[in-house]
Amino acid sequence: MNPNGKALLKENKRYYLLDSLRGISTVSMVAFHLCYDIFMMYGLDTSWYFYPMTAVWERSICVVFILLSGMCLNFSENGIKRGVLLNLAGFAVTCVTVIAEPNQAVWFGVLNLIGCSMMIVSVLSDNLKKISPLSGALISLLLYAVSYDLQKGCVGFFGLDIVKLPDFLYSCKYLAFLGFPSSDFVSADYFPIIPWIFLFTAGFYLWNFIAQKNLAKYFESKIPLFDKIGKYSLWIYLAHQPVIMGVLMLIM
């Protein structure tokens, strides 16, 4: 996500539909975490998290946010600066969770992933743009699919393990941010650079493809209310869990 809701301006136009899509995903995220807290933390249905549709719901939120973040990087005047700010926000989340709930601490969560992706792609953008948008998007999606199971120690495709990676890659806890978590690594929200940066670059190329095909005009429309929510998605992300937990403590 471009979580701060900025940088959607291009040639004095704002692509409100991107705000709106991010707003819809933000509402979905809040609803998901509300359900998680009710069913899992308060024990109403501790099997809820393991239902197939729950996994689909959770993953859909992540995918949309990361794709949109890659798309919106095309409008950022200083992607490196924004990336640093998001990493600082991610670090703040880590500090708070380590203090408040050590067993549920967040190490390299989605804010850190998006922040690092912004910085990396900003540095490489001139070279990345030498690849055609369609080819870049397809290559990115292929790399995302192939490296999706990297955390499990292999490279594969749609669950098929093709190459098993050497164990030493997973013996150093400091490589977890890259996608090589050690056996004792635990994080309540974990989005390593690999494979997720490839989804980010897919979004980056997707917007270039949209612009190339003169389709950007269709993104000038808005979905009322959701476009407003989308502009404040970072603040909602940072505040929603404490608010949800506070409300549930009062009523349950």
Task: State where each predicted segment sits.
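Alpha-helical transmembrane segments and their immediate juxtamembrane cytosolic regions
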Residues: 1-252
